[in-house]
Amino acid sequence: MTVDEQVSNYYDMLLKRNAGEPEFHQAVAEVLESLKIVLEKDPHYADYGLIQRLCEPERQLIFRVPWVDDNGQVHVNRGFRVQFNSALGPYKGGLRFHPSVNLGIVKFLGFEQIFKNSLTGLPIGGGKGGSDFDPKGKSELEIMRFCQSFMTELHRHIGEYRDVPAGDIGVGGREIGYLFGHYRRLANQHESGVLTGKGLTWGGSLVRTEATGFGTVYFVQEMIKAEGETLEGKKVIVSGSGNVATYAIQKVQELGAVVVGFSDSSGWVSTPNGVDVAKLREIKEVRRARVSSYADEVEGAEYHTDGSIWDLTADIALPCATQNELDGDNARTLADNGCRFVAEGANMPSTPEAIDVFRERGVLFGPGKAANAGGVATSALEMQQNASRDSWSFEYTDERLHRIMKNIFKSCADTAKEYGHEKNYVVGANIAGFKKVADAMLAQGVI
């Protein structure tokens, strides 16, 4: 049986066993396509059911989360934790609180996390979790009660050497605080390393808040350097206006580029003169208002509800909002308008068709599992500080993050070249991330 037939047969089986999980199917299909190249060259990676084991979570947890609102009404949400692979270290990955969360989305995120964490070079496995709870419109006490109920079940499955969750969409510093506080009460110990994204006074790390956005920019900076260019003077589109987007905007402008647009779920803002990051942070983090407020208050900025942010002309695009936000038509428009570099700050924000268009049109593309690995890398640095009872300076932590992102780019670039797909960073990231995990799995036996 040829490698194509082996992979095709396995993927057909995976579709049947994981029906109704399109995001998970999409993530696996992309990786399997890259792995065909590895299996042709190194067939021993097909031994001992390795591919099947890699695509099957070690453990899937689904649990009810009952909580009481401010009016005394009981609500029941569903909680998830997918502990996907621990060959390299304890499961590591965020918690997402959003109405869209279901098992398929958590599995897709956990599967991507395996390769992302592997690429960091740090000893962490892959996992992901969350709930279909919506924090929007909830009071402080309602969010606290929900977090405490969620942790009442989750606490028995996590630990600094077992599984280390962090934040994600809907789970910020406030939620991490409530989750950690309840874990501490249930466990009767101050186990700092059990969660990352903590407050600075109780075990958190500097740069953690900025890490994903900064890291995405450090990655695209390496992509540009490899072409003999710099960020200076380049025009950049950044979708989103949350944590990742805000700090990507800050860092890319510090390095000399101009951000010409950003967005939220209500619309997008064109900013031909660049973005006032302090004003954006005040609007989104303090007032929690829509991006239309930015256009109302900053001269030269315009708010749009029609068209797409991807209609803007730019050299670089950084999708930092949510999965599948950038489709094939958007990709064609970007390429037509002269965009030459794309790096994903969000998880899987580009559709498979969009990625194909970028490849066909010669647009260099940095996949999320590599480009946005700065967040989990700095989470692992937080774990290191917790383990040594130490606290590092902002400058030192940022320098470590920058070095990790440079190494991730080099690993992707070198691996892509080794397997005959130079500058295809999707292939490079998938294969480089896979080989490290696969070697560990083969060494540890069939478990």
Curated annotation (Swiss-Prot):
Name the Gene Ontology molecular function terms of this record. Answer: glutamate dehydrogenase (NADP+) activity
Enzyme Commission number, as recorded: 1.4.1.4
Catalytic reaction annotation: L-glutamate + NADP(+) + H2O = 2-oxoglutarate + NH4(+) + NADPH + H(+)
Question: For site (Important for catalysis), what residue positions does UniProt give?
Answer: D168
Q: Which residues bind NADP(+)?
A: T212, N243
Cross-referenced PROSITE patterns: GLFV_DEHYDROGENASE
User: Its Gene Ontology biological processes?
Assistant: glutamate biosynthetic process
Name under which the protein is recorded: NADP-specific glutamate dehydrogenase
Q: What is the lineage of its organism?
A: Bacteria, Bacillati, Actinomycetota, Actinomycetes, Mycobacteriales
